[in-house]
A protein has these predicted regions:
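Active-site loop/oxyanion-hole signature of alpha/beta-hydrolase fold enzymes
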Residues: 16, 60-102, 106
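Conserved catalytic-core motifs of eukaryotic protein kinase domains, centered on the activation segment
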Residues: 44-46, 70-76, 137-139, 226-227
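Flexible "cap/lid" loop of the alpha/beta hydrolase fold
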Residues: 112-116, 123-154
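N-terminal cap/lid segment of alpha/beta-hydrolase-fold proteins
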Residues: 1-18
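Conserved alpha/beta-hydrolase catalytic His-Asp/Glu region
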Residues: 137-138, 152-209
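Conserved serine/cysteine hydrolase catalytic core
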Residues: 187-241
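Conserved HGGG/HGGXW glycine-rich cap/lid loop of the alpha/beta-hydrolase fold
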Residues: 16-71
């Protein structure tokens, strides 16, 4: 079995010091780059090494600034545009020119903007419930709907609300949030997700990407209003059952 190796990547983005925690595997084919979602980490994708059909593919996954084992010197500066710059810097550090891209939630939005800015580098894009419309801000819009006195107060109340969300595995997700995301990073991430979802023309950016595209979603989100539209534009849909 071709296992992965764990490494650290030291970067500076907009004057912010980063120590990126990453896992990767070498190989001869174009690599798969994974960008995790909000409240998740690189380990979400480590089981790629257990998939025989992907055994020939190298891959790279890392903890985004504000998440997991990655160190960030100024958490308040993190936003989706900041995460896009980070992704580009990580790719350049790893000498990755062309790649297959998969992103979930926050990582899906980051991946979309990364693909839009670098269409010649992305060979395929699997968007796992990443934001492409205002209706996708069911978590991030809470930064507006539930104002709080400070970052820690918002985060603690967010964790409690998430515990009771009627979505599969919400209690498990809620229980892990304090271990996977820094409270001080949440406002910048959520605010930029809302701004981009409302005004960033994400749908147009997504359907106009020249690479093959897949949109994955859970069965609880099959009522998303745009699924038929993106399918008509050539996006492959993949519904995941419970």
């Amino acid at each position: 079995m071709n296992e992965f190796e764990k490494t650290n990547i030291f970067l500076q983005i907009d004057g912010v010091e980063l120590n990126i925690s990453a896992i990767s595997r070498k190989g001869k084919k174009p690599p798969i780059v994974f960008l995790h979602g909000f409240g998740s980490t690189k380990e979400d994708y480590a089981d790629i090494i257990r998939q025989a059909s992907l055994s020939d593919y190298p891959f790279l996954a890392y903890d985004a600034p504000g998440s997991g084992e990655t160190y960030c010197s100024e958490l308040e500066k993190i936003s989706i545009p900041f995460l896009v710059k980070t992704a580009l810097a990580v790719l350049d550090h790893a000498n990755i020119e062309q790649f297959h891209l998969a992103g979930h939630s926050m990582g899906g939005l980051t991946a979309l903007l990364l693909s839009h800015q670098n269409p010649d580098r992305v060979l395929s894009f699997t968007d796992i419930e990443g934001n492409i419309a205002p209706e996708d801000c069911f978590l991030s819009r809470q930064i507006i709907e539930y104002p709080a006195a400070n970052a820690n107060e918002f985060f603690e109340r967010f964790v409690e609300r998430t515990l009771h969300t009627p979505a599969y595995s919400s209690p498990l997700y809620s229980a892990s949030l304090r271990h996977k995301i820094r409270a001080e990073a949440v406002e910048g991430i959520f605010s930029s997700m809302v701004e981009l979802s409302d005004h960033g023309e994400l749908m147009d950016k997504f359907v106009s990407l020249p690479c093959p595209k897949m949109f994955m979603y859970g069965e609880q989100n099959r009522a998303l209003t745009y699924l038929g539209y993106i399918k008509s534009k050539g996006v492959r849909l993949s519904e995941i059952s419970e």
